[in-house]
């Protein structure tokens, strides 16, 4: 919470280290572009390296550059199949975006292969937007998943390293039974 008054900035300069309030809402909405100049405080200063020090910062800013250093580089000879295969069971009539966003998020986060199991009315919408996503549909599943689709989905889920279930499925009672069955029967890690 911002106490008192605050100025909406185009630029903020935060000496040596970013201040938490500049990166979290609501302060982030007022900070503008943030610059953090080095003013020669050594990183090994006691207040930084010792969590028991009374002035220890206790927080770290995760920037894309910081995260990139933590992630292993993929070998040049690797194949997309080396990085997992996610099976998503998502979507219903009017909810193609939920299935697409779940699958796109998996690809963006490094999953090698993604297969999206959706009702047949949604099946052509996804590859048209994101050709990397493979799609399939249970026979006779037009607009929403039902209990009769569970065997088809369970059989195909075993091809994936993990399964995502739920994005945009809706709340129809027939879909609820389908979800209960999948939660009991799918043996791969289920999200």
Task: Annotate each predicted stretch with a short phrase.
Residues 9-11, 17, 22-191:
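Small-residue (G/A/S/T)-rich helix-start motifs and N-terminal tracts that mark the onset
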